Swiss-Prot record:
<keyword id="KW-0472">Membrane</keyword>
<dbReference type="InterPro" id="IPR041701">
    <property type="entry name" value="MetN_ABC"/>
</dbReference>
<dbReference type="Pfam" id="PF09383">
    <property type="entry name" value="NIL"/>
</dbReference>
<keyword id="KW-1003">Cell membrane</keyword>
<feature type="binding site">
    <location>
        <begin position="38"/>
        <end position="45"/>
    </location>
    <ligand>
        <name>ATP</name>
    </ligand>
</feature>
<dbReference type="InterPro" id="IPR050086">
    <property type="entry name" value="MetN_ABC_transporter-like"/>
</dbReference>
<keyword id="KW-0067">ATP-binding</keyword>
<keyword id="KW-0813">Transport</keyword>
<dbReference type="GO" id="GO:0033232">
    <property type="term" value="F:ABC-type D-methionine transporter activity"/>
</dbReference>
<comment type="subunit">
    <text>The complex is composed of two ATP-binding proteins (MetN), two transmembrane proteins (MetI) and a solute-binding protein (MetQ).</text>
</comment>
<dbReference type="GO" id="GO:0005524">
    <property type="term" value="F:ATP binding"/>
</dbReference>
<comment type="function">
    <text>Part of the ABC transporter complex MetNIQ involved in methionine import. Responsible for energy coupling to the transport system.</text>
</comment>
<dbReference type="Pfam" id="PF00005">
    <property type="entry name" value="ABC_tran"/>
</dbReference>
<dbReference type="InterPro" id="IPR045865">
    <property type="entry name" value="ACT-like_dom_sf"/>
</dbReference>
<keyword id="KW-0997">Cell inner membrane</keyword>
<dbReference type="GO" id="GO:0016887">
    <property type="term" value="F:ATP hydrolysis activity"/>
</dbReference>
<dbReference type="InterPro" id="IPR018449">
    <property type="entry name" value="NIL_domain"/>
</dbReference>
Length: 344
């Protein structure tokens, strides 16, 4: 549905050229909720704005539904953009228009007849839960409701793609969850492809199918969300996941473990489980089979894409030969085993 090929973006700054994006390649299938995450300045917003050519790339191509947007004329591009809705962190509603009027605005500008506008807008307001607020003005509704208006307005032209640029970052956690639930429902009911930009891994965990991690304008990691959480490879990904699922021990415990590791006593492990593995007595079975001691230092259970996900930090001790066999057994059971070290 969306394909980004060899895309780079440069801007001229006071100290010379700045490369905001470097050779980005992504493929986003139709009907997927795809997350793009990174720290501030990673290039996320620049990337999402190239998908509808609000920002034209310096190099590369952007294909949406098989059409290369970079090769379209101005008129053709305007037509193609009708298939791409967009919502932003700031709601950009007209204070002089009602909720209905704000959602209807793009249709009015496109010359759509009044009867057709009503037939389009009223179901959208019902979809986003604002049918009862249709005659209210922006000053009379909450921030979460304003974002729902923005979503309905973005859907008014019946797009195939919805771009979300930090759409929940200005909202409180409860409202954020409600908006994410709404986006997921829209994805399911309308078959809409959603590209979601965020700096919050919690958002990725709750709503996305796949994720790309952006750092300094480069895609440093990409994959299914559950796989990225279980097997993060890049240090930026690890740091972002650590914002949601603790990856580090408390400092005092870390110091004690480091001293113990220096003596060669034990192995510090991060174990990650998913699905049925969370409910199975895998650790106790490993202890019985291989006569190991597991000291659990830290643990957490969460849910990703509706599947249970568990993460443990353990200190394992036992006979060297049996330790290796135990690690192999754990991996056979679908457990991700990562040996850590805090020794400087």
């Amino acid at each position: 549905m969306i394909e980004i090929r060899n895309l780079s973006q440069r801007f001229e700054g006071p100290r010379g050229w700045i490369e905001a994006l470097h050779n980005v390649n992504l493929t986003i299938p139709q009907g997927e909720v795809f997350g793009i995450i990174g720290r501030s300045g990673a290039g996320k917003s620049t990337l999402v704005r190239t998908i509808n050519l609000l920002t034209r790339p310096s190099e590369g191509n952007v294909f949406v539904d098989g059409r290369d947007l970079t090769q379209l004329s101005a008129g053709e591009l305007r037509g193609a953009r009708r298939d791409i809705g967009m919502i932003f962190q700031h709601f950009n509603l007209l204070s002089s228009r009602t909720v209905f009027g704000n959602v209807a605005l793009p249709l009015e500008l496109a010359g759509v007849k009044r009867a057709e506008i009503e037939a389009t807008v009223l179901p959208l307001l019902d979809l986003v839960g604002l049918a009862a607020q249709k005659d209210r003005y922006p000053a009379q509704i909450s921030g979460g409701q304003k974002q729902r208006v923005g979503i309905a307005r973005a859907l008014a032209s019946k797009p195939k793609v919805l771009l979300s640029d930090e759409a929940t970052s200005a909202l409180d956690p409860e409202t954020t969850r409600a908006i994410l639930d709404l986006l997921r429902r829209i994805n399911r009911e309308l078959g809409l492809t959603i590209v979601l930009i965020t700096h919050q891994m919690e958002v990725i965990k709750d709503v996305c199918d796949r994720v790309a991690v952006l750092d300094a304008g480069r895609v440093v990691e990409e994959g299914n969300v559950i796989d990225v959480f279980m097997r993060p490879h890049h240090e930026v990904t690890r740091a972002l996941i650590g914002d949601v699922i603790a990856q580090e021990l408390p400092p005092a415990m870390k110091a004690r473990v480091a001293e113990r590791l220096k003596t060669g006593s034990g192995h510090l492990l991060r174990l990650a489980f998913t699905g049925s593995g969370v409910d199975q007595p895998i650790l106790s079975e490993t202890i019985r089979r291989y006569e190991l001691d597991f000291n659990i230092l830290h643990g957490q259970i969460d849910e990703i894409q509706g599947r249970a996900f568990g993460s443990l930090a353990v200190l394992a001790t036992g006979e060297p030969g049996k330790v290796g066999q135990a690690f192999a057994y754990l991996r056979e059971q679908g457990v991700v085993v990562e040996e850590l070290s805090y020794v400087e």
